[in-house]
Amino acid sequence: PICDFLDYLVMNVHNTSNNAGKKRNLIRGLCADIKDVSFSLDSKIFGENFEVLPLGIGKNAYRMQEDILFCKERGNANSTFNELVVMSPFLSESVIADFNLTDRALSDCKRTLVTRRSELGKLKASDVDNFTIYTLKDEIIDGEEEISDELADKKKQDIHAKIYLRRKYSDVDLYLGSMNASYSAINKNVEMMLWLGTKNMYLNGDKFLDDIFCGPAGDVKNPFEEVTVADAVLETESDNRNRLEQKIKELNNHESLEVIEKSVRLKLKEKICF
């Protein structure tokens, strides 16, 4: 599958790009080397149960929409689960609503969504009434600000990981990679995912959440907090205000650059005239 992905990249190096031929040869060389490589997890938790899943690369693409993770056919054994954890920075309402279907739940089913607060506005309460939802606390987001070297503007950071954990009885499926819980990512985009299989005794939703929460969900050390879709309203207003402030900063920086540029041109003109 990795070679299929690289072959797709070779075909999509445009002739107009710089050093197109060199880029193609480099990718082909990498593909040839990978064929001589064997992969092993060397893990007690996962054993050798793993698979690379390239999405959106044409005829050799893995059809993620047909994976058991997204099976919602009533009566199909693959559609049900005991635990589901979805961590995704970006969402589509339809994807989350399908995960939320009542008839997908087995006994004592737990569903958890970890996302960005700004995404909650895409959802209705009925889309997530079987989910417990978490977002990063404001103080964590504010504490992870990134400063742009060019404009010295602060840009807030939030979760980037895309992780899906599904448990049915003792079997656990873990998916890691680039695919958001969005319709486009699952059905259209070029993405790369890794599937890992394990057992409930080694990993499950509760153990995973205890890990990322740094203990129990209610502990003060937990960087996440429980929220509802109603919390999206205030966040949207805050986001709009932040975007406005960002645009004003960019405009001010742009105007400052123009003033400096005009000043330099004027000085050069004076020197030339002299």
Region spans (language model):
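PLD/PLD-like phosphodiesterase catalytic module centered on the HKD motif
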Residues: 1-274
